[in-house]
């Protein structure tokens, strides 16, 4: 399979984004004559993140891009030669130069699907040496993407469907790649937009942003714009000096608010006028550079009303400090009173945007009934996942040469499930998930209405379940290196995530002390586990 041009260049994973022991194992396999043994690995996690009962599968598109472009360049091989033993057979490095993923097959949970412990997010099969080399980069691509998508989904559940969520954590992210990944998968998880321009260009994430305090403080009030005139929104009639018009309105606003006309900061007003001249149809004011009540709010109202006289409507205001909930409620009261006073009904519904180190607890307060907040900007708490910085994904060998393999350990949680498997979601009559079931790939596909004997984790006896619907979970994504079907767009995966979460029961969806979702084994898979634990051959 020829290497494909990577449209995102350095933003993508590369073959040497890996741990050295993958290369040392590759040499060991090659030296043992096992490089081309047929093998299968599964990528999964053992516990749902953040103490919850669900995760979202993400990162598949990045994995596909990586696999289709996988080739070791001469420089890669030369570097490996420099860190492997100097007496390594040169034929091994020639073997590396010829590697690609043309014999690799991948089955996967679609991006945006609900994922649960032990259920593979990816099944990767192909020559042993190649699929071993894929372990670290695939974990890197899937684990953080799934973690941040799940984190974003939790924040969306707290915010509810009406609040707009803006991801604005690029400057807080763990490096450029972390920032791009966070912006991409916070959108998949339910955020509405991102401040990250590169995520918009490369991934199609809707972008949003206005102005910072530096823009406001850069103005003193003495500046004269080169063209202070603004034409009416309808395009007819002479232009108007917006700064002069805002000054006229300021006197009326200050009288209405009981302020002296000298109290609002002139530099802040000049900044608002400059921004309004640049964005007359998208004017927003940042209110808390000096004083929300004595400066930011009256200056915003003066400029907004001047724009309104020309047929434009201000979009919103932003708060970045203080008691955000209380300020938003008070600002909304001012907007309603000003709308009535100046007979501009649209002013009542101007958006109120808030930001300032918002975490789950603060978000719950801002989302409560009676909050007047419309848009919530979240940075650090979404991109860094402070409650749990790692998903804990693993990539484990389950079969070699068609024979099952199992990791046996004294820690039952770290035992792996052997063999090539199929995964199914068992659904109730209302379409809500009841449990996921893993079975051996060669077993018959379970049918809706069929009574199934299954083994819950750690159970001493099987139980029975009769699903109303059965949903296969793993889709054939790559077969012998070829894409089997077009991947969904990011927006489509986002829609799937929202639909999947809406179908999950409230007991499993709640964020504190949720009911744990069961992943069960078929009788044949449980029997295989028991035989291998007893030291018997499969």
UniProtKB/Swiss-Prot annotation:
InterPro entries: Aldolase_TIM, NAPRTase_C, NAPRTase_N, Nic_PRibTrfase-Fam, Nic_PRibTrfase_pncB, Nicotinate_pribotase-like_C. Changing residue 288 to A: Partial loss of activity. The modification Phosphohistidine is found at residue 213. Transiently phosphorylated on a His residue during the reaction cycle. Phosphorylation strongly increases the affinity for substrates and increases the rate of nicotinate D-ribonucleotide production. Dephosphorylation regenerates the low-affinity form of the enzyme, leading to product release. It holds the Pfam family NAPRTase_C. One of its GO terms (cellular component) is extracellular region. Changing residue 19 to A: Complete loss of activity. The modification Phosphoserine is found at residue 537. It comes from the Eukaryota. Nicotinate binds at residues 21, 210, 318. Changing residue 21 to A: Partial loss of activity in the presence of ATP, complete loss in the absence of ATP. Pathway: Cofactor biosynthesis; NAD(+) biosynthesis; nicotinate D-ribonucleotide from nicotinate: step 1/1. 5-phospho-alpha-D-ribose 1-diphosphate binds at residue 380. GO terms for molecular function: metal ion binding; nicotinate phosphoribosyltransferase activity; transferase activity. It catalyses: nicotinate + 5-phospho-alpha-D-ribose 1-diphosphate + ATP + H2O = nicotinate beta-D-ribonucleotide + ADP + phosphate + diphosphate. Keywords: Cytoplasm, Ligase, Magnesium, Manganese, Metal-binding, Phosphoprotein, Pyridine nucleotide biosynthesis, Transferase. PANTHER family: NICOTINATE PHOSPHORIBOSYLTRANSFERASE. Homodimer. Belongs to the NAPRTase family. Catalyzes the first step in the biosynthesis of NAD from nicotinic acid, the ATP-dependent synthesis of beta-nicotinate D-ribonucleotide from nicotinate and 5-phospho-D-ribose 1-phosphate. Helps prevent cellular oxidative stress via its role in NAD biosynthesis. This is Nicotinate phosphoribosyltransferase. It comes from Homo sapiens (Human). The lineage of its organism: Eukaryota, Metazoa, Chordata, Craniata, Vertebrata.
